[in-house]
Amino acid sequence: MGYRIGICDDERSQAQGLRDMTEAWARERRLSCRTELFPSAEAFLFACTEDSAFDILLLDVEMPGMTGIDLAKTLRRENSRVQILFVTSHFELAG
């Protein structure tokens, strides 16, 4: 089974690190995955179409413009099946 994974983070190094961890996780489990990076929620929405559904999304909580939480709310109205994980480098937001 292959997974399509989207990572939305405005900090490029964070996004690349998440991609590396995600791909290592998939390799260890002998799963195929295709990972795509997006620098903003708006960039994700622009690139996302009905035929390009993601299985898993990793969304940065704090981004300029639309936040990861706002993006998740928008996506949930359209697709209740996608798995969403929130990520942050702000310790006060981690729980």
Language-model features: locations:
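Active-site residues of response regulator receiver
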Residues: 9, 59-60
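Two-component/phosphorelay signaling modules centered on CheY-like receiver
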Residues: 12-36
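Acidic, metal-coordinating helix/loop segments flanking the phosphotransfer/catalytic sites
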Residues: 37-56
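Acidic catalytic/metal-coordinating carboxylates
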Residues: 40, 67-71
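Conserved phosphotransfer cores of two-component systems
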Residues: 49-52, 74-81
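Receiver (REC) domain active-site loop signature in two-component systems and cognate sites
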Residues: 63
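Alpha4 helix (beta4-alpha4-beta5 surface) of REC/receiver domains from two-component response regulators
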Residues: 70, 77, 91-95
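Hydrophobic/aromatic residues positioned on beta-strands within the core alpha/beta folds
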Residues: 87-88
